[in-house]
Amino acid sequence: MDIKELLNKTDRFAANAGCKITEVDEHHAIAEMTVTSAHLNGGHVCQGGALFTLADLAIAALMNQHGELTFGISNNIMFVSSAKEGDLLKAEATFVADHHKIPSVEVNVTNKDNKLVCHVTGMGYRKSVKLPTE
């Protein structure tokens, strides 16, 4: 099972939030989510936690693709524009540095018009254990 299938099956939090990995290769990972009424905050725009969940799933796919368990240890999110109900969002994660122990990534979350919604940077820690397969 590849990382896309594995995380789409086992990351229940992301799945329950409507997030799904659509693409993973050596250099990037993409996750997508359509904003629903369940994602909206009191201002009637997509809640920041939903945006972070989408970005975090793309980060997880990129950092864990070689089967070595990697957890996030630091993340920063900058909100640039609002996402509204019905928007299809795409989070594309790329490596800044694919260090063997502490990789760092950046993620751009965009809407269907390729407008930047938020920018995320993150660092992970690769443990010396295999990624669980269930």
Task: Enumerate the predicted regions with their spans.
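Terminal targeting signals and extreme-terminal segments of soluble enzymes
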Residues: 1-134
